Amino acid sequence: MARGGSRRRNTSVISTQKIEPSNESTKAPEGPQKRKPKTEIPNSNGNGVIKKEIKKRKLDNELDESQEHLAQLITDFNLSVNELFQLKEYKTIAYWNPDDFSRASSTSQVPEIFDLFSKEPEYQISWGADSNEQDLSNIPLRLQKKIINEREQKLLEKFPFKEKVLKRSRDLEIELLQNIRQSKKTLEKSHIKPSPPVKPSKTSKGNQKIIKKKQVVKQEEEEAQENHQNEEYESDMDEGTHYKLKAVKYSIPPPIVTHPSHIPSWVPDPNHTESSFNSKDSEIIDYHPDAIQFVSNSKTTYTTPNIQAKIQNFLASYKSAIIDETSSGDFNNTLEEYEKIMTQQEQFIKKLYEKTSIEKRLELNGEKIERRKTVLPHSSNTKQAVDPFRSHGAIIPKTQGVTIHSTHHDYFLSHGMAFSRLHQQMRRQHQLRTKKITQMIEQHFKKKKGEKERLAKEKEQNLKRISKMAVQAVKKRWIQASKVYRFLQLQKEEELKKIKGREHLSQMLEHSTQLLEAQFNKSSRDISEVDTENENETDDHLSSSSDEDSGSPQNARDDSNVNMDENDMQLTVEELRAKYADIDQSIEPSSKTISSDSSNHESDSDDEDIDANKGLVALYGNNAVSVEPVSSLAATEYTDEQKTLIEKFSKEDEGISSESVSDDSLNDSSSSESDDDSEVDESNHKQVDSTKPTGLAALLGNGPTEDEEDSNDDVSADSDGNVSDDENMSTTDEEDEPKTPKSSEDPKMDEKENESDVLEEEVNGSKVRDVPLPPLLRGTLRPYQKQGLNWLASLYNNGTNGILADEMGLGKTIQTISLLAYLAAEHHIWGPHLIVVPTSVMLNWEMEFKKFAPGFKVLTYYGSPQQRAQKRKGWNKPNAFHVCITSYQLVVHDHQSFKRRRWRYMILDEAHNIKNFRSARWRALLNFNTENRLLLTGTPLQNNLMELWSLLYFLMPSSKVNQAMPDGFANLEDFQTWFGRPVDKILEKTSNGTSSDVIDENDKTTQRMDEETRNTVSRLHQVLRPYLLRRLKKDVEKQMPGKYEHIIYCRLSKRQRYLYDDFMSRAQTKETLASGNFLSIINCLMQLRKVCNHPDLFEVRPIVTSLAMPRCVANSFASTDSVVRKYLNDDSFKGQVSLKALNLDITSLDQLNYFTSQTTSKLKSSSELDKQADKLNELISASEYDQPNLDNFLEYYKFIKSNEQVGIRDNLKHASYLNSLRCDRIPLLGESVIKFLQTATQPRQPFTDAYNDIILSIPKRVEKMDDVIEKYSVLTPSVVTLDLKDQLIPLSTQRTIMNEVANKNIDNPFHKSQVKLSIAFPDKSLLQFDCGKLQKLATLLQDLTANGHRALIFTQMTKVLDILEQFLNIHGYRYMRLDGATKIEDRQLLTEKFNRDSKIPVFILSTRSGGLGINLTGADTVIFYDSDWNPAMDKQCQDRCHRIGQSRDVHIYRFVSEYTIESNILRKANQKRQLDNVVIQEGEFTTDYFGKFSVKDLVNDAEVADIPDKPLEPAYGNVENVLAQAEDEDDRVAANAAMKEVAIDDEDFDEESKAATNTATPSQTPGPDTAGSGIVDSTVKINNKTDSLEDVDYEDGVSHVDEYMLRFIANGYYWD
C-alpha cells in the first residue's frame, strides 16, 4: 500500500505542472496567514536545502526566463507522455515509476514499444510550423537523412538556443527523478509510533467481514489522500518572514455513508437467501467516525497522525495463515487461530522432513511427495561373466531408504535366479559369436573364388568408360568445329549480303536517274515530233512495212536477248557497268526505217540498246527473265505478230503475279463465276485496252501504242516529263533524241495533241507535258492542282503508279476527279474505276463527283449484305457504272466480288491507313485485278519509314516485272538498312534541342547535316522522287497566310500539383513504372494527363454535407426542463388570490379613461374615514376589558360594546382601503391611447402603391435577398441535429405550420438558405481556378475575342469537352460542339453555320471526331488543350483551319503543363518532328514521326530515378486499344461514341496478321530472297546459342587439327 500510494503521489506531482498546495490551509483556524502558491518543487530536507538548491540552480542556469520556462514545459511534456503511455498500456498508474521509461535516466533502457509510441506525431514537440508536415515514409533513406539534416539546420538557425533548452530540460527531468527517489527513501526510513487500536462498535459476526472490507477501502482512500497531501513540495515558507508560523492543522469531515444502512432509503432485502446472511445483517449500525486531521509544519508537510496510527496498528496486528486457497474458504483469523494453524503446519513440515531426509521412505517427484521405490540394477549390459560361486560376485538387490531385513532363504533364491539369467546370457553370446565367425569364413572363400572374373569385368568397364569419354570429347570437338564453321560462314554471307545491298542501292539510284532522263528525253522527243509530223507519217508507213518484213529477225533478237540476260546474271556489278557504260550514247536519233539489210554497225548498236534495256529490266526484276518483248529503237511500230506475242506474255505475267501474291484465304471463289467475269471483262475492255510496253521499255524505247481504235491517243500517252534537277542527274540537251512516229487515222486529233504537246512545265523536279483541262470537269483548277493533274497524267502515260501526298487541304479529291475526267475525255477510258475511302468521307466523295464531274455514273457501294448484293447485280455489264466508291471495311468483306472485276484504276484515299503490310486486308487489296493504282494521303509517314515502304510495295510489287518499280522495295530488310537506321541517327544528330515557343517550319534541317548524312538523304529523295508528289501549302499557295505555332506553358494549380505529386509518390506508381508493362505504364501516364488537363478528371471535388445526428445534447435535459417549465407555468394560485383586489392586475385598467380616473380620484374620502377610525382606536385602547369577568354583568356589557367598536373600526379601515383602491385607479395607457393605436394599425383605409413598394412581403423579401443568400450562405455546419426544431418550436406551433403547409397557405421562406447551409456544392469558379490550363484559356480567349479572332479548341478526351462547355457557359461565350456523337448529316450543317455566323467565337472539337474533309476556315486560331499521342492527328486538326480559303494568318496555341509528363512528351515529339524536314519535307514529301518513348524520358522525375531507360514497345497495332483501356469507364464509353467513325475506318487496318500467314503465303509477304532468309534463320539459331560457344583453344589459335576439321566440314563430308 505504501508503494502504490507513493506512486500515485508522484503521479499527482507530474500531471499538475504548477502546484498550488496551500489553498485549503487558509481555511484552518490555526493559520490566519495566507500562503502564496509558488512553482518551485521543494525538497523534504528543509528550507536550508531548498535555498542551496535554488542558488545552485541560478548559478548553473544561463538561460533567460522564457527559455527556462520552455525547458520546464518540455520536461513536463515528456513526463506527461510517459504517464499517458502507462495509462494506455497498463490501464492504471498505481504502480507507475517515472524512472522506468525516462530517456533522461541513464539507468533505464527505453522499450521499443514506448519508443514507437513517443514517435507518433501527436506526442512529439514541433519546433517549426512546417517541420513535420511532409511524410517521409515513402522517401528513400538517403533523401530522408538529407531532408532531416536540412530541417535541423533551419531550426538551429531559427532557434539557436535549442540545444541549451533540450539539455536544460534533461537536467530538470533528472533532478525531478532524483527527488522522487529521495522521497521514497525518506518514507522508508521514517518511523511513526502506532496509536492504540480503535475499538469498533458492536457488530454482528455476519457483518464483520463487510465492515472490515469497508474499513480497508476507507483506509486506502485516506492513505492515498494523505500521501497526496504529504508530497515533497519545495517549501514556500521563508524563515525571514514566517518565523512565527510553527504548524497548521485542519480537519476533513468524515464520509457520511460507511454502510448501506446509512442510506436513508435503504431497506434490507427480505428475499435474500444466502447462508451467510442472517437476521443480524439487517441490523442498522450507528457509526460515527472521527474527522481526519491534517498537520503541517516546517519539517513535515501534511501528516495525519490518527490515520498513521491506525495503519501501524493494523500492520502490527495483521496475521494471515499460509493455507491452500483452492481448498479453503475465506478465513478471518484471530491471533489464537493464527497461532494454532501455524503450529499445525510446523509439525507437518517436521514429519515430512523426517520421512524424506532421515528415513528416506518418501521422495519428491516433481510437485508430489511419493513413496520411494526399490531399484534393481539392469543386468543385460554385463560384459564379463560372474563367478556364481563367489559371494562377492552375487548380485544383491539394493534398496534405497530403510534396510529390509531378509532371511537366508530369500538371499539364496535371489542368487539362484540371478545365476540362471547370467547363464542364459552367456549362452546367447556364444551363439552370436559363432554365427559371425561362420559368415566371415564363408565370405572369404566366395571372394577368393570369383576374384579373376571380377578383375576382368572391372577392367572392361574401365575401358568402356574411357572410350565413352573419348567419343564424347571428339563429338564435342566436332560440334564446336561445326559451330565455328557456321559462324564463319554466316559472317562471310553477311559481308556478301552487305556488298550486294550496296550494289543494289547503286543500281536503284542508277534506275531512278535513267527513268527521269528517259522521261525528259521523251518530252523532248514529243516536242520534236511537232516539227516533223509530215515526215513521220511517211516514216510510219515505211516502218510498219519494215516491221512486218522483219518479224522473224525480231523474234530471233528476242531469243538472243534472253540468252544475253542469262549471261548478265553471271556478271558482277563492275562488269555490268562496263558493259552498259555507253548506254546513253547507244540511244541515237534515227528518223529512218531500219531494215533487215542494215549495216553491221547499226545492228550492233541496236543489239546494245536491246541488251541495255534487257539488263536493266533484269536488274530490277528480282533476277527474273522478263518475258515482255522490248522493241528496238529503230522500229517505230510493232507488227501484228509482236502485238499478239506481247499481249500473250502480258496475260501470262498478270496471271503469274496474281498467283504469287494471292492469299489462301482469298482463293475460295468459284471457277464458273470467274470465267463469266473474265469473259465480261474481255468484252468490256476490247475497245479500250492497249498493249503497250511499260516501265523502262516505254521510256527508253517507243512510247505506248494503243489499238487501232485508240491510236489517236498516242500523243497524250507519251506525255511523261519527269526530269531531275539534281546535280547528280544532269542531262544532255544537245543530244538528238530518237523520234517516235505514230500512226493516226484522225489528223484533226493529232493536230490538237501536237498543240498541247508544245507546252510543258516542271513538276517535282521533272518536266511534264501540260495536258488540256478535261471538258467533263466543272470548275477551274488552281495552278498547283493543274500541275498535279499533269503529273498524274504522266504517271498513266508512262504506266507507273504513284502516291499523291499533298498536304491536307490542297484538293487531292479534285485532282483525282480531274485525272478520271482526263482519261475519259482524252483516252476514252471511262472505267470502271474503284475508289476506296474511309467510311466517314464516302458521302463527301459522292458529293464532289456530282459537283465537279456529273457526267460520271457513280456507284456508292454501301448498305446491308442484301442491299450490296442487289447493287452487284448487272454491274459486269458494259457502262453499268464508271466509278465505284466504297469503304475499306466493305471492300475487304466483299473482296471475292471485287477481285473478279477488272478495274482500270484503284484509288485509295487516306492510304496511310494500309501501313500494316502484315495484315490480311493489305494482302487482299494487293491482289485486286487493277491496271493502275493511285494512293492519296496527307501523311505518307506517321511512325516510321517502314510504312512508306509498305505503300511503295503496294503500288508495284516485285513480282510484277512489267512495272518499273525497283526490286529494293520488295526487300524490307535492305530498305530498312539503307534508309531506316540512318534516318534514326539523323534525328539524334540534328535535334537542336531548342525550347522555342514558335516553331519555324522554313528551317532546312539538311543544312545542319554532315556530308555523309546529306548523301544518305539525297539518295532516299532520288529513289522516291519518280513515284511521289508532295506539295505543302506554304510552297504552292504563295498568297496563303502564314501559320505560326506557339507553346503556352501552364503552371499547375495548387490542387493539381498536390494530386500530381501524390500520385507520383505512391509506391504502386513507382512499381508500375519500373515494371515495364506497357498497359500499366500507359494507364499511369493517362492518369497523369488527366491531372494536367483538369483535376476533376482525376478526383472530383466532394459535395460537403453536415453530419446529421438524431438527437442534440440538450435532449438529455428535456425531461428536467419540462418539469421546471411545468412548475413555472403553474397558474393554480390565480384562482385563490384576487390580483384585482390587490390592485395588481394592471391590464384590466386599459379600458378606463384617463380623464375619468382623474375625476374619480377627487371623490376619495379615505382621510375622513381614517380620522373616525383613529378616534375609535383611542376609545378601544382605553378599554381594560380584554378578559371580562363573566359574573360581572357590567363588565361583560362593556366588553361587548368594545367589540362592536372594534368591528366598526375595522369596517371603517376597510372602507377607507376600498375608497383609496377604487379612487386611485389610473390606467397604464388609457382607453384613448389604445383606441388611437388600434386605429393606426387597423387597415381601415386602402394602402398606396408607394406603401406596398416600401413594405415588402415575405416572398418579395426572399427574392430580394436571393443574391445575399447565394453569396454568403457558404458555411456548412459540421454537425446538425434533427430534433432541434422540437426543442425550439412548440408542438402546437409545429402542427399549425404543418397544416398551413399542407393547405398550401404558406411557403418556407428559409428553404434556399437551409439548402445552402445543409449541402455545399463546389463553387463554379473553382472549375477555372483549379486548373492552370483553364486560367490561361480564359486570358487567351479574352484577348482573342477582343481582337475579333475566332478559335477552334481541340482536345483528345471527351470529358474535357464537357468541362469546356461549363467553362464557356460561365464566361458567356457562344460556342458549338463537334465530337464523335455528332451525326454525319449534322456535321456539315455545324461547320457551315460556324463559317457563316461570325458571332460564334469558339468551336470545341475532339481530335478523333472523324470528318477528314471538314472545312473550318472561318476560324483563324487553333488551340490544342492537350496534345494527341500521335502528332499526325494534331496536324490534321491544324489543316481544318489552315487550308485553301483562309484569308488570315493562323496562330496555333498548344497548352503544355510545365514540369509534367506533357512537357516531356512535347520535347520528344519535337525531336521526332525533325524527321519531317529530313525525309519528306526537303525531299518534297512529309512525315509525322511518333518515335519510341521510354518511361524515363516521359516521367523525368527524381523520385523515380531507378526506372530503367527501356523503350515502350507495345504489340504492333494495339496502341489504340491500350489507350482505350487506360480510360475511365464513363470516359471510355464517351470516347468510343465520339470516335465511332474513326473506329470503323481504323478497324480495317489495325488487324494484325496471324502467325501462320507468313508460312502459308511466303510469296505475298515482302522480304529478302530465299538465300537471304536462310541466312537470317541460321543467324537467329546461332545467336541463341552464342553463349555456349566457348572454346579456349579456338580463341588461342587454330591448330593443324582444327584446320583439318574445318576443311573436312567445308567439303561437305560432315553432317550433324
Swiss-Prot record:
Transcription regulation as UniProt keyword: yes
Gene Ontology annotations for the cellular component aspect, listed alphabetically: cytosol; Swr1 complex
Biased composition (Basic residues): 1-10
Low complexity bias locations: 200-209
Top enzyme category: hydrolase
Subunit structure of this chain's protein: Component of the SWR1 chromatin-remodeling complex.
Protein name: Helicase SWR1
Segments forming domain Helicase C-terminal: 1333-1486
Motif residue range(s): DEAH box: 909-912
Binding site for ATP: 806-813
Cell inner membrane found in the keyword field: no
Organism listed in the record: Debaryomyces hansenii (strain ATCC 36239 / CBS 767 / BCRC 21394 / JCM 1990 / NBRC 0083 / IGC 2968)
Bias (Polar residues): 11-26, 1555-1567
Main location: nucleus
Biased composition (Acidic residues): 529-538, 705-737, 752-763
Domain HSA: 396-468
Function as written in the Swiss-Prot or TrEMBL entry: Catalytic component of the SWR1 complex which mediates the ATP-dependent exchange of histone H2A for the H2A variant HZT1 leading to transcriptional regulation of selected genes by chromatin remodeling.
Record EC number: 3.6.4.12
Keyword terms: Activator, ATP-binding, Chromatin regulator, DNA-binding, Helicase, Hydrolase, Nucleotide-binding, Nucleus, Transcription, Transcription regulation
Compartment(s) of residence: Nucleus
Every Helicase ATP-binding domain range: 793-958
